[in-house]
UniProtKB/Swiss-Prot annotation:
Transmembrane segments: none annotated. Belongs to the UPF0237 family. HAMAP family: UPF0237. Residues 4-82 form the ACT domain. The lineage of its organism: Bacteria, Bacillati, Actinomycetota, Actinomycetes, Mycobacteriales. This is UPF0237 protein Cgl1544/cg1742. PANTHER family: UPF0237 PROTEIN MJ1558.
Amino acid sequence: MFAIMTVTGQDHTGIIAAVSTALAELDVNIHNVSQTIMDQWFTMILHVGFDESVLDIATVQERMKPVEKEQGLVIRIQSEALFNAVNEI
């Protein structure tokens, strides 16, 4: 399954490391990533892939909650199909 993950919050050291480590522990592969900082506000969008017979989106979201709390972030994930449908012009 492919999904889109968004990460936002106050910029500080270690955000990318914390998010990528948590995803690696879940065996979630990062296919593409775009990251920027706007006025001390960190934003990152990741295109990720994982085996949906082993893991589902709800589990990924739940397992990212400790990273959200520890890093002071908002992390959201949705299926690539849903993301594309919502953002289609």
